[in-house]
């Protein structure tokens, strides 16, 4: 029977051991018809930004009810060697944010680093998942309803598309919510 793949799952339960968090996440996924989860590097603790933390997560996920795959987190401090090490340790792709990575150790990437990372990931034949909101356009939004301004997503998506075209990087934008951005993908 076919099932869904949850791309970018956040696995973190405050106060629980990591293995327990994976057990709970796997059971919840299976109940919802999800047969594979791809874990986002954040809000995981430790954040999946180096090979050692990825190995820790892989061990903890060994008892999950569904197959678990992992994304490596790209941050301002990520080097080409870090990317290669994460891939060698089992990262099936990488994830970053242009505005807020969800945790201090997965902070937003600037334009120059985004382009460098994309070039490295193209060389590694890997994929990059990007939370594409332009941080400057977000300003000081207050509350969840104000945080996903369509123009912020459009500007972020424009930056990601330009960088991906230049580097040839396979890129997935997530989440994607502003209907006006669909025309950019044609």
What name fits each language-model region?
Residues 58-74:
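A glycine-rich helix N-cap at a beta->alpha junction
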Residues 11, 42-46, 72-77, 100:
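Acidic, glycine-rich active-site loops and adjacent beta-strand->loop/helix elements
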Residues 1-63:
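Metal-associated gating/positioning segment near the N- to mid-region
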Residues 8-13, 69, 99-103, 168:
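Short, basic, glycine/proline-bearing loop/turn elements
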Residues 3-9, 37-39, 68-72, 92-96, ...:
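Hydrophobic faces of well-ordered beta-strands that scaffold small-molecule active sites
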Residues 81-186:
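Histidine/acidic residue-rich metal-binding segments in metalloenzymes
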Residues 33-38, 64-68, 161-171:
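Short, surface-exposed connector motifs at secondary-structure boundaries
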Residues 18-26, 76-86:
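Short, acidic/polar
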């Amino acid at each position: 029977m076919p099932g869904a793949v949850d791309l970018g799952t956040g696995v973190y339960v405050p106060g629980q051991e990591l293995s327990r968090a994976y057990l709970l996440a796997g059971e919840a996924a299976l109940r919802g018809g999800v047969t594979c989860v791809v874990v986002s590097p954040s809000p995981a603790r430790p954040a999946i930004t180096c090979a050692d933390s990825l190995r820790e997560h892989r061990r903890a996920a060994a008892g999950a009810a569904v197959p678990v795959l992992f994304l490596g987190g790209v941050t301002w401090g990520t080097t080409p060697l870090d990317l290669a090490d994460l891939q060698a340790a089992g990262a099936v792709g990488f994830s970053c944010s242009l505005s807020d990575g969800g945790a201090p150790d997965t902070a937003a990437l600037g334009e120059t680093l985004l382009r460098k990372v994309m070039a490295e990931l193209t060389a590694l034949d890997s994929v990059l998942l990007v939370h594409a909101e332009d941080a400057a356009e977000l300003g000081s939004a207050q509350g969840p309803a104000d945080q996903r301004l369509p123009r912020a997503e459009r500007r972020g998506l424009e930056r990601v598309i330009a960088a991906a075209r230049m580097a040839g990087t396979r890129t997935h934008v997530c989440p994607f919510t502003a209907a006006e951005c669909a025309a950019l993908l044609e």
